[in-house]
Amino acid sequence: RGLLFLPYLTGERTPHMDPQARGVFLGLTADHGRAELVRAVMEGVALACYDAFSVLVELGAHPERIVIAGGGARSPLWRRIMCDVFGAPLQCLEAGGDQSAIGAALLAGGGCGILNPAEAARSWASLGPRLDPDPTRNALYQDMLNLFREAYVKHREDFRRLREFASRS
């Protein structure tokens, strides 16, 4: 509904490496309600993830699917948004425990030569059902991505100036 969110609440890393970047709602009107704000936040985060992912694509990565995990992955709406933004099949990692900590332990075990991280991960976790992207929504999100990227560039100086104001008060 004409609402875009830049999710840079604590700065941004890849691809901008900009600690001064800040969150911005573009297009906000009195007609937007809670549901539109929440969806804009979800879409903004998904677009930022795709923006970072694009760096890997530029370096030659071409994944067959996207695998997500964690809190956001439990939301069917967020899975749908991520799938449509990325334009690739999506699956959710189905595993118990703290997935980040377990992943770090698997990598550490591989680094020490104790185990093969890929084999250990396959025995520990499985993937949920495959979700395929909707081509129409993917095209819409690609247009939104262009606006999203342009909005960051247009506001980059504003972020710096706001930081200056904050440091003076």
Show the residue positions of the predicted features:
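Glycine/Thr-rich phosphate-binding loops that ligate phosphate moieties of nucleotide
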Residues: R1-S169
